[in-house]
Amino acid sequence: MNTLTAVCSRGGNIIACPHGAIGIDQEMIDYLTRPEDTAKHASLLGSMIAFDLHKEFGIPACIYDAIGTDEMQPIARVTGLPEIPRFTVGHTLNTRAMAIKCAEEVLKKPFNECTFIVAHLGGGSSIRLYHKGVNIDCVNDDEGNFSPERGGGCSGKELVKLCFKEFSEGAGEKTVMKKIHGNGGLKAHLGTTDAIEVEKRIEAGDKYAKVVYDAMAYRVAKDIGTLSVPVAGKVDRIILTGGIAYSKYLTSQIAEKVDWIAPVEMMPGEYEMEALAGGALRVLRGEEELQDFAEIKASAVDRIRICEGVEPYTVPEN
């Protein structure tokens, strides 16, 4: 290979951005590297490398389906605490890519004419509802099901008690956050994040490993059922993807609980590199627009506003 036409990277946690391609410029890099504006994530490095290649070779550079992609409908954002609205963050790149692939190869229909529930099952798991091309609702990795590393949703009252207990014993916010987001789920119960090891324990007769692992499948299935409600159960396909979707033990349990909603497609693994290449190619062909970061930042508040005249509790920095 001696010609490079464009470069496309995973996107960092740009708050409330739409799906698709966003051009990388100095303003984006400045935003992504300011700790007060965005959370630390490995994908930040990709954006910086892509921008360096853009400057060196004069080729287009973009991010695609960033982890901060948030297109949730206003009604889905409301919680009982105005200070804590709901938002979307996480596995947009792989879940949207798998939904597009399923639409094209299985249903033979345009993606924006279909409705999918896509469960990304990995170290952290999230579930997305794609309706007519838009991710209108989700279950984030800290809201519902637990996973190998995440604690998932739990009693708010008990969580408050746990936080105060940890603080009284000298722990700080980072320690408590790590307990929930990194050391929760299978790791907390079984001391490992390796699903293969857990299944071997189950085969060897470990009853506790079985009930915890089965509970993880149960919670995923419940969340899939939850996301069928906003579209009145009119779902074209349920897709199980991510690294743990290779587990027939786990996916069979999930499928048997949700296949009454829609047929279940097993699409294990991740399709992220192909998704980045496909996104860049669609931009080069003129099939998708290369969006401007400054415009996205300027309109971010409107995208996460619950109601006209009501300011979001969390306002993106301009």
Where are the language model's segments positioned?
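Phosphate/pyrophosphate-binding loops at sites that engage ATP/ADP/AMP, CoA/4′-phosphopantetheine
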Residues: 1-5, 105-109, 223-236
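Adenine-nucleotide phosphate-binding core of ATP-dependent small-molecule kinases
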Residues: 172, 178, 182-233
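Glycine-rich phosphate-binding loops at beta-strand->alpha-helix junctions
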Residues: 235-254
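Conserved phosphate-binding/catalytic loops in two-lobed NTP-binding clefts
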Residues: 248, 252-278
